[in-house]
């Protein structure tokens, strides 16, 4: 395995776990890629939603990247506005433009985000062509848009069911930007497929966020799969002892997700 590191212009850190090329498994020398975007309320990036998640997808045969994107560490810093999305879209662009080097299929690049990182992952699919993103990256095409989106207990809305801290760190008091970042109102028919999971008992980011997204995706006929688990709270990541949230039932999301991606990408080990 190769370990890859890259620093984006903002200082955001991209790391990659890349499977080695081999003559013994030539059919798998080119693999799909997945970019992990940890949560943390846009204030930090959770380690529990980084490597433990990456290892699950690495085991499923993916080349895996993790992005530590720009965050607002305290209230003395200005709102982040578009910078996290510029970071994430820039990471997707970097993966695609280096697909041959990374032995990645450039048409099979997924993103996976949790909580605020879920908002960011969804934004890469929904707001990839927003003017601030296109201008910052110098692109006018779909190079920075993912081919599939995986969301765990995502922040979606800036409305009444929002996670206030995440939206405050992202938008501050800018009402227009808050409206733009309320993603359930930005859905359109040309989006990539979504896989979404949430717990009904989540007391931090309401399950209504995922339900609002699912409703909007349904309205616009965007393919998606939604899994709701009754018990457990927020930030459960892989639902294992390693991340201090063991739940044998809820951890089924990992297998459900890798099966969904395998069918979508026609990539079966």
State the predicted function of each range.
Residues 46-47, 67-106, 245-249:
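Catalytic nucleophile-loop/oxyanion-hole region of alpha/beta-hydrolase
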Residues 190, 195-198, 202:
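Short beta-strand/loop motif that positions the catalytic acidic residue
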Residues 1-29, 160, 164:
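N-terminal cap/lid segment of alpha/beta-hydrolase-fold proteins
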Residues 203-212:
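Conserved alpha/beta-hydrolase "acid-adjacent" motif
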Residues 90-166, 178-179:
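Primarily recognizes the serine-hydrolase "nucleophile elbow" in alpha/beta-hydrolase
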Residues 30-39:
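Short beta-strand element of the alpha/beta-hydrolase
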Residues 47-65:
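Short amphipathic alpha-helix adjacent to the substrate-entry channel of hydrolases
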Residues 211-269:
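C-terminal catalytic histidine-bearing segment of alpha/beta-hydrolase fold enzymes
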């Amino acid at each position: 395995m190769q370990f890859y590191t890259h620093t984006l212009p903002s200082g955001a850190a991209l790391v990659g776990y890349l499977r080695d090329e081999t003559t013994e498994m030539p059919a798998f020398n080119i693999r799909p890629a997945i970019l992990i975007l940890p949560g943390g309320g846009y204030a930090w990036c959770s380690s529990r939603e980084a490597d433990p998640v990456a290892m699950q997808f690495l085991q499923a045969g993916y080349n895996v990247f993790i992005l530590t994107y720009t965050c607002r560490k305290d209230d003395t810093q200005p709102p982040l506005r578009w910078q996290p999305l510029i970071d994430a879209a820039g990471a997707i662009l970097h993966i695609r433009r280096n697909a041959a080097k990374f032995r990645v299929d450039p048409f099979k690049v997924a993103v996976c985000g949790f909580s605020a990182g879920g908002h960011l992952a969804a934004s890469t699919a929904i707001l990839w062509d927003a003017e601030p993103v296109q201008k910052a990256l110098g692109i006018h095409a779909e190079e920075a848009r993912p081919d599939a989106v995986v969301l765990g207990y995502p922040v979606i809305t800036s409305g009444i069911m929002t996670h206030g801290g995440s939206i405050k760190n992202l938008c501050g008091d800018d009402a227009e930007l808050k409206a733009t970042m309320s993603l359930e109102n930005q859905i359109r028919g040309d989006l990539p497929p979504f896989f979404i999971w949430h717990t009904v008992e989540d007391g931090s980011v309401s399950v209504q966020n995922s339900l609002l997204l699912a409703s909007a995706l349904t309205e616009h006929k965007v393919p998606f799969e939604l899994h709701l688990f009754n018990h457990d709270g927020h930030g459960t990541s892989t639902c294992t002892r390693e991340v201090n949230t063991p739940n044998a039932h809820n951890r089924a999301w990992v297998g459900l997700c890798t099966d969904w991606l395998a069918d979508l990408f026609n990539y079966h080990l």
